[in-house]
Amino acid sequence: MKDRAADPVTKFSPSPYETGQFLRISERADVGTPQIDYLLATQRPDGLWGSVGFELVPTLGAVAGLSSRPEYADRAGVTDAVARACEKLWELALGEGGLPKLPDTVASEIIVPSLIDLLSEVLQRHRPAVGGKAGQEQEFPSPPGANAELWRQLSDRIARGQAIPKTAWHTLEAFHPLPKQFAATVTPAADGAVTCSPSSTAAWLSAVGTDAGASTRAYLDEAQSRYGGAIPMGSSMPYFEVLWVLNLVLKYFPDVPIPREIIEEIAAGFSDSGIGGGPGLPPDGDDTAYANLAGDKLGAPTHPEILMKFWAEDHFVSYPGEQTPSETVNAHALEYLNHLRMRRGITEFGAVEDACAEWVISQQTEDGCWYDKWNVSPYYSTAACVEALLDARKQDEPQLDSLRRAREWLLRHQTDSGGWGMAEPSPEETAYAVLALDLFASRGGEGAEECAAAISRAKEFFTDESRENPPLWMGKDLYTPFRIVDVTVMCGRAVVGRY
């Protein structure tokens, strides 16, 4: 908490997508070699970038960056990296079933068609011969889930200098180069960032030139220098980072003093519309729920009526009009309403609580877990849903059955190492599983002993501090929010230490 109070810069992992786009767009003299070094070092043996199942966005972004700098074309590795990536992309596109449906990462439906259009000539140069005949034109296909029409509509508005929804500012790199008339409709946050994205900010800066303020240049200086040139997926999301850390600390380390600067920072970011992930980002239901929850625990005014602005008939939304609702947004909102009822005696939201709990239960898989659009791991979303449902108002049979199935799913998926994970067990995912099982074990009843035994078996897994966490959080690319993950693992270790 002291580190966060002293250094509010968000600590997110670097991203091949963001680095590639930054390399393509930025006009800074020192952009080039550091970004290329990172991209060449992170290319997979098969020629792609990114995590399995999430390759298309980071690979297209990396190819866009590497192929945009002709002055580096003769450098060893660059031409080969582009060729290997394009050949693998064609292999996927022309293979049985074609390209898979896009994962629900942020704005992938806009980013992918923009990059396919941008890279049409590059992809065409590396198209394999079909039927033994080379040189035949064949467009690279658009994957299911891409929305080229939406990208074209937004592009047309931008070309005419018209404003676009603020939620689309996060991906201005998809419309580079931007007309100066349009750029005048975009206002960076006080810290200089355009909706927390270095590549989007670079696209805006390219359009406005010397009209940009010193804060924007300082923001890009920091983003560019943090990892030696590799660019983080998002930056300047301090509210999201601190709210997730703060709520974990308040639950599992309640004696740790909370710095006054952090409380003041959250209060300053909260408005009548709620709070977003950072300055310049629109308010969302997730951050608003967690800001209310932490604030009430710390004695600040609480505003359930503001959270209710994100209520949509039977569930809470992250943003109005979103394509895919979030299980964990609803879990966090329900956790806050549970807290108000149990700790403050506020019962006026009972109907909302019941409907929200029913919606969460309806999203559970047959296997017993939950998935979510903000974190690819089911352990993150299952832990959040378990915590919300255990304290929900109606403890009826559907709810009890849902919790039983979740408990059995967690117990069933512990590995011989004592850890949990989608692929290889990871400390982050093991922590989520342990925190959820601890909620069951600490309340007694059916399955409590089995949960306690599983937690005890996780002790050995946590003794190996060399284990790494894969990027699991979903932005434009998969990423790791280092502070949030570090504190999550600390909480998991603290719980295991009690068994």
UniProtKB/Swiss-Prot annotation:
The reply to whether Isomerase figures as a keyword in the UniProt entry is yes
pH-related activity note: Optimum pH is 6.8.
Cofactor list: Mg(2+)
Regions that span the bilayer:
none
Q: Which reaction equation describes what this protein catalyses? A: (2E,6E,10E)-geranylgeranyl diphosphate = terpentedienyl diphosphate
Q: Which residues form the signal peptide?
A: none
| Family matches, as InterPro entries | SQ_cyclase_C, Terpene_synthase-like, Terpenoid_cyclase/PrenylTrfase
- Keywords attached to this entry: Antibiotic biosynthesis, Isomerase, Magnesium, Metal-binding
Its activity depends on temperature as follows: Optimum temperature is 25-30 degrees Celsius.
State the phenotype upon gene disruption: Mutants do not produce terpentecin.
* MF GO annotations: intramolecular lyase activity; magnesium ion binding; terpene synthase activity
Q: Which GO terms describe its biological process?
A: antibiotic biosynthetic process; diterpenoid biosynthetic process
What EC number is given for this enzyme?
5.5.1.15
List the pathway annotation: Antibiotic biosynthesis
Q: Cite the binding residues for Mg(2+).
A: D284, D286
**Record-annotated disulphide pairs:** none
Function of the molecule:
Involved in the production of the isoprenoid antibiotic terpentecin. Converts geranylgeranyl diphosphate (GGDP) into terpentedienol diphosphate (TDP) by a protonation-initiated cyclization.
| Official protein name in the record | Terpentedienyl-diphosphate synthase
Its encoding gene is what? cyc1
